[in-house]
Curated annotation (Swiss-Prot):
It comes from the Bacteria. Coiled coil: none annotated. Keywords: Flavoprotein, FMN, Oxidoreductase, Pyridoxine biosynthesis. Homodimer. It comes from Zymomonas mobilis subsp. mobilis (strain ATCC 31821 / ZM4 / CP4). FMN binds at residues 41-46, 56-57, 62-63, 85, 120-121, 165, 175. The gene is pdxH. The lineage of its organism: Bacteria, Pseudomonadati, Pseudomonadota, Alphaproteobacteria, Sphingomonadales. This is Pyridoxine/pyridoxamine 5'-phosphate oxidase. Catalyzes the oxidation of either pyridoxine 5'-phosphate (PNP) or pyridoxamine 5'-phosphate (PMP) into pyridoxal 5'-phosphate (PLP). One of its GO terms (biological process) is pyridoxine biosynthetic process. PROSITE patterns: PYRIDOX_OXIDASE. Substrate binds at residues 46, 103, 107, 111, 171-173.
Amino acid sequence: MTQDPHKMFDEWMDEAKKAETDDPTAMALATASKQAFPCVRMMLLKGHTKDGFVFFTNLGSRKGHELLENPVATLLFHWKKLRRQVRIEGAATLISDEEADAYFATRARKSQLGAWASEQSRPLPARDVFEKRIADIEARYEGKDVPRPPYWTGFRVSPIRMEFWNDREFRLHERELFTLNDGRWQSEFLYP
């Protein structure tokens, strides 16, 4: 039995990248408001190390507000073809500006422009308003590199719990839970 859930995650992700044709890095991100109302949405994992799991967003979005007010999150990866899922719980912290800048520079130009144009999660009166904003920003940065907006950054979820779930016949699933205690991972199996 492995005692390193990060290594196990990497192994499962490698298998998912071979088996899943559509976004094996897709994950559900659950946050909660200060009033404890949960909200979940799909995101893409953009990095994983022993320090945590990184994704990027607009701080003005609902998830941005919730993570700043209540900096905890749960991630869920579901790989249907492999009949597996991984659930990760932990503290969410902002990444460094340098890390956010480096990732932003790798994004497609249209995605960079969209980050400037979108007032994410705010009401949009009509689609053409958004398209005009994109065109205006595209004109502003014509022939120039697009810098990262100050409100666009990443979060790192540093896990304290990681559960690995394997589907089994007759709903006799296999669940292994890793819990971080005093800097060491402990594992146990759970009833399905």
